[in-house]
From Swiss-Prot:
High-level lineage: Eukaryota, Fungi, Dikarya, Ascomycota, Pezizomycotina
SUPFAM superfamilies: Mitochondrial carrier (SSF103506)
PROSITE patterns found in the cross-reference section: SOLCAR (PS50920)
Family affiliation: Belongs to the mitochondrial carrier (TC 2.A.29) family. SLC25A38 subfamily.
Gene3D superfamilies: Mitochondrial carrier domain
Annotated protein name in UniProt: Mitochondrial glycine transporter
Signal peptide: none
Length: 350
């Protein structure tokens, strides 16, 4: 995606630079993979506890669940049960998501739909984000589309992960869980709960990007992190090492806090869909479809059950999203600085 801006303040001949805010697709895939793996491994215990709590009739059993796991012969292993499918799902899911998100945003921007959020025009000499600046509507749509596509591809891993984490099933291995699902439910079983997952993830991802970009705008306006100036682009290195360190620290702080705030807001709005999705994936024979699951959950467990695991999910999402997006953005910016794409900068004459 190319965004052309006047750069006469740095060029006496009045020439303009056409600067691409895009980067190589492999950068986004690798950065997404690294960010997803790190957050999945570190926060697996919280994800496991959330799955256990959202099981039927256990919406207030957090302490009981923790005590039960800690009293087992291998408590540490029990807390990290299901780490492999979770890491595969989150790692490759994040890689696919960030790659798709970047491609969609470039496509929209190339069609002339680039609408900066940070004022009428961004300072093209500097930027803190690996993402282009789009309108709120474009942020919402691209986030939702990218998450839905990645979620569909990774759905079989998600189903296996949820079944393996739950204590409803006595699976001894991940591969055994997959074989049992296919044998008893067919390949369709590997996509149990996709409707609820898509309805949860699409608005979550869309709202997240909107809240994330808006939070960064507000924090920068408040001089959060002690510095309002963004870091230089790779073709304009910092003149002083101290300034560069301040720029890096400031952008990391803004990205991390923005990620946590955005995740908290988006999670609280979409948690009922997460509960329904978990029930569908755990008990497909009991719940025929999403609408049927909602009716049964409300009748048997009440409205409160739709917010089961909200505290855990909100805490986990806030930390994991903040970590994942901060790592992703930093890796992209460092990759662009170390391996600049010469095709991204084109000298133009007026």
């Amino acid at each position: 995606m190319l965004a052309t801006a006047d750069m006469s303040d740095g060029y006496t001949n009045g020439a303009r630079l056409k600067i691409s805010t895009s980067s190589k697709p492999k950068f986004h895939f690798i950065a997404g993979l690294a960010s997803g793996l790190s957050s999945a491994i570190l926060l697996q215990p919280a994800d496991l506890l959330k799955t256990r709590i959202q099981q039927a009739h256990q919406t207030s059993a957090l302490l009981f669940t923790i005590r039960k796991i800690l009293a087992s012969p291998q408590p540490i292993r029990g807390l990290w049960r299901g780490t492999l499918p979770s890491a595969l799902r989150t790692g490759f899911g994040s890689a696919l998501y960030f790659s798709s998100l970047n491609a969609l945003r470039q496509c929209i921007a190339n069609q002339g739909a680039l609408v900066p959020l940070h004022g009428d025009r961004d300072d093209k000499r500097t930027r803190t984000s690996a993402l282009p600046k789009l309108s709120h509507t474009a942020n919402l749509l691209t986030g939702a589309m990218a998450r839905t596509a990645a979620g569909f591809i990774m759905m079989p891993v998600t189903v296996i992960k949820v079944r393996y984490e739950s204590d409803y099933y006595a699976y001894r291995s991940i591969w055994g869980a997959g074989r049992d699902i296919v044998r008893s439910e067919g390949f369709r079983g590997l996509f149990s709960g996709f409707g609820a997952t898509a309805i949860r993830d699409a608005p979550y991802a869309g709202l997240y990007v909107v809240f994330y970009e808006q939070s960064k705008k507000n924090l920068n306006a408040l001089n959060f992190g002690g510095l309002t100036t963004a870091r230089p682009l790779s073709d304009e290195p910092a003149r002083e090492d101290n300034s560069e360190k301040q720029l890096v620290t400031s952008s990391i702080s803004v990205n991390f806090v923005s990620g946590a705030l955005a995740a908290g807001l988006a999670t609280s709005i979409t948690n009922p869909f997460d509960v329904v999705k978990t029930r569908l994936q755990l008990m497909p024979n009991k719940y025929r479809n999403m609408a049927h699951a909602v009716r049964l959950v409300l009748r048997e467990d009440g409205v409160r059950s739709l917010f089961g695991g909200l505290g855990l999910r909100m805490g986990r999402k806030a930390i994991s999203s903040a970590l994942a997006w901060t790592v992703y953005e930093e890796l992209i910016l460092k990759a662009e600085k170390r391996w600049p794409d010469q095709d991204n900068i084109e000298q133009l004459t007026p």
